[in-house]
From Swiss-Prot:
Keyword hit for RNA-binding: yes
Organism this protein belongs to: Ehrlichia canis (strain Jake)
KH type-2 domain boundaries: 38-106
GO terms assigned for molecular function: mRNA binding; rRNA binding; structural constituent of ribosome
Lineage of source species: Bacteria, Pseudomonadati, Pseudomonadota, Alphaproteobacteria, Rickettsiales
NCBIfam families: rpsC_bact (TIGR01009)
Name this protein carries in UniProt: Small ribosomal subunit protein uS3
GO biological process: translation
Oligomer and partners: Part of the 30S ribosomal subunit. Forms a tight complex with proteins S10 and S14.
């Protein structure tokens, strides 16, 4: 089971929590779709800001959006000009008041999503997939990860037949629920087609939130 499903979803309410912090009796699908559009828009608007996650909380007349980024300066811009512009665009899109908070990610080398995006960007620049995977794995372990596993799938190196290549170092116990495992996925759009990049990072054992 642990090998097949998303490690973050599997550990919800054990050591992880949701990225959408709200409850709704009605209009649930509308609000869920709004969350999806918000995340998509923010990711697209700040593609180079290394965004690891977007947490959305709702009140009656306010939507609070916390953006976790390794490069907060890219989002804020000069004197906050960029962030104000994005706020106005979001208000137009969802027709509601919004509070946008930017939170800096201290160790981006340990965030699986950012590692996957970094590898995907290297593949798009035609860097060897083995070199890209190995470099990211070494950087992650150097910062303090207990283990990391990386998978690249597609027409690697322009090969005629698609295949999957793995690179793993250290321990990644996917079946252990108390194991704090971060998971990330990204796609590299190359001239040969799309290459999928998956990353699992083991950060050590954590006490469950129920204890």
């Amino acid at each position: 089971m642990g090998q097949k499903c998303n490690p973050i979803g599997l550990r919800l309410k054990i050591i992880n929590t949701w990225d959408s912090l709200w409850y709704a009796n009605k209009d649930y699908t509308t609000k869920l779709h709004e969350d999806f559009l918000l995340r998509k828009f923010i990711k697209k608007a700040f593609y180079h800001a290394a965004i690891s996650k977007v947490v959305i909380a709702r009140k009656v007349d306010l939507i609070m959006v916390n953006v976790y980024s390794a490069k907060p300066g890219v989002i804020i811009g000069k004197k906050g000009a960029d962030i104000d512009k994005v706020k106005q665009q979001i208000v137009k899109m969802i027709n509601n008041n919004i509070e946008l908070n930017i939170i800096e990610v201290k160790k981006p080398e340990l965030k699986a999503v950012l590692i996957a995006e970094n590898i995907a960007q290297q593949l798009e620049k035609r860097i060897s997939f083995r070199r890209a995977m190995k470099r990211s794995v070494q950087n992650c372990l150097k910062i303090g990860a207990k283990g990391i596993k990386v998978s690249c799938a597609g027409r690697l190196g322009g090969a005629e037949i698609a295949r999957t290549e793995w690179y793993k170092e250290g321990s990644v116990p996917l079946h252990t629920f108390r194991a704090n495992i971060d998971y990330g996925f990204s796609e590299a759009k190359t001239i040969y087609g799309i290459i999928g990049v998956k990353v699992w990072v083991y950060l050590g054992e954590t006490k469950s939130s129920n204890e």
